[in-house]
UniProtKB/Swiss-Prot annotation:
Function as written in the Swiss-Prot or TrEMBL entry: Kinase involved in dpp signal transduction pathway in the process of wing morphogenesis when the levels of dpp are enhanced or inhibited. May down-regulate insect immunity gene expression after prolonged infection.
Catalytic activity, EC: 2.7.11.24
Known regulation of activity: Activated by threonine and tyrosine phosphorylation by Mkk3.
Name the record gives this protein: Mitogen-activated protein kinase p38b
Compartments, record wording: Nucleus
Organism: Drosophila melanogaster
Gene3D superfamilies assigned to the protein according to its UniProt record, in alphabetical order: Phosphorylase Kinase, domain 1, Transferase(Phosphotransferase) domain 1
Major site of localization recorded for this protein: nucleus
Domain Protein kinase per the UniProt entry, residue ranges: 24-311
Pfam families: Pkinase
Entry-linked InterPro entries: Kinase-like_dom_sf (IPR011009), MAP_kinase (IPR050117), MAP_kinase_CS (IPR003527), MAPK_p38-like (IPR008352), Prot_kinase_dom (IPR000719), Protein_kinase_ATP_BS (IPR017441)
Keyword Phosphoprotein: yes
PTM sites of type Phosphotyrosine: 185
Modification sites for Phosphothreonine: 183
């Protein structure tokens, strides 16, 4: 929010001071994590609800500052119905165009009613529901992948849904390869492609498709498909379903310890997916088999999955947009915290809301 006339007010939320423009009213906390606190709010004079995230210590270190820059750049780049995007960004420092006063970053995004976790836990989904939800995930993924971005951490809690069953993918691309393990966060492992989880080999965008397969299986059955308690247990559960990998695939696993471990196990046959997903639509089972493919090079892509017969009811190639390529060259840079802060400041002050959201904002801003 580079609008210099904005009046800010302060309030205390869970022992954290928030300082936000009067544009945003009725703040209520909805979540808190290592990287920030999230509140829902109403745009003054409208019924529009938004989510506001206050980043925790955005410039505490060069690592924090680079993460802040990454999140802001990614959100700014994304403009798609099935992907969370940036509605507004602001900082309370005055004067607004002074880098010296720039210490806090607040990001405004769409407010969603629930995530897939809530939905899986509270209702039995029809096949049509599953089709529509998976279609939207794939439609959003096609867009994200076309930008050259890999999500890396797709799971039910990162997929938001509103009461009309409209879906958006959250928190994409924030886990870089170097920090992608998130030790101790069990639920992440359950949906993570084996090639990422076990550092088997170079991974590509189909790592996200594995995650969609795990999510789709859970939508169909109401149960987590591979609820591993650790990496080894996770791998065992996967092989109990998919069978022991072929020798040709094994030869491409770069981790010798992983190869030796798999070879030490009894040979496991592949289970029939029709037995695991009894009563499921045969087309759903066929798509699942193409998503839950151990070999990332043979795994179906988002674009191919959208054209699968299971998606026929919703598939419309003219309405499945692609994105401009996202410039990730900054990832190579190791810069001091002040330089990252300056770059974040430039992004914040240059931000322009979409025309639709700008219409809702007070005109003096």
């Amino acid at each position: 929010m580079s609008r210099k006339m904005a009046k800010f007010y302060k309030l205390d939320i869970n022992r954290t001071e928030w300082e936000i423009p009067e544009t945003y009213q009725n703040l209520q906390p909805v979540g808190q994590g290592a990287y920030g606190q999230v509140c829902k709010a109403v745009v003054r004079g409208t019924s529009t609800k938004v989510a506001i995230k206050k980043l925790a210590r955005p410039f505490q270190s060069a690592v924090h500052a680079k993460r802040t820059y990454r999140e802001l750049r990614l959100l700014k780049h994304m403009d798609h119905e099935n992907v969370i995007g940036l509605l507004d960004v602001f900082h309370p420092g005055q004067p607004a165009d002074s880098l010296d006063q720039f210490q806090q970053v607040y990001m405004v995004t769409h407010l969603m009613d629930a995530d897939l976790n809530n939905i899986i836990r509270t209702q039995k989904l029809s096949d049509d529901h599953v089709q529509f939800l998976v279609y939207q995930i794939l439609r959003g993924l096609k867009y994200i992948h076309s930008a050259g971005v890999i999500h890396r951490d797709l799971k039910p809690s990162n997929i938001a849904v509103n009461e009309d069953c409209e879906l958006r993918i959250l928190d994409f691309g924030l886990a870089r390869p170097a920090e992608s393990e998130m030790t101790g966060y069990v639920a992440t492992r359950w949906y993570r492609a084996p090639e990422i989880m076990l550092n088997w080999m170079h991974y590509n965008q189909t790592a996200d498709i594995w995650s969609v397969g795990c999510i789709m299986a859970e939508l169909l059955t109401g149960r987590t498909l591979f609820p591993g308690t650790d990496h080894i247990h996770q791998l065992n559960l996967i092989m109990e379903v998919l069978g022991t990998p072929a020798d040709e695939f094994m030869s491409r696993i770069s981790s010798e310890s992983a190869r030796n471990y798999i070879r030490s196990l009894p040979v496991m046959p592949r289970r029939n997916f029709r037995d695991i997903f009894r009563g499921a639509n045969p087309l759903a089972i066929d798509l699942l088999e193409k998503m839950l493919e151990l070999d990332a090079d043979k795994r179906i892509t988002a674009e191919q999955a959208l054209a699968h017969p299971y998606m026929e009811k919703y598939h419309d190639p003219t309405d499945e947009q692609t994105a401009a390529l996202y410039d990730q060259s900054f990832e190579e840079n190791e810069l001091p915290v002040e330089k990252w802060r300056e770059m974040v400041f430039s992004e914040v002050t240059a931000f322009k809301p979409t025309a639709a959201f700008a219409e809702l904002l007070p005109k003096e801003q």
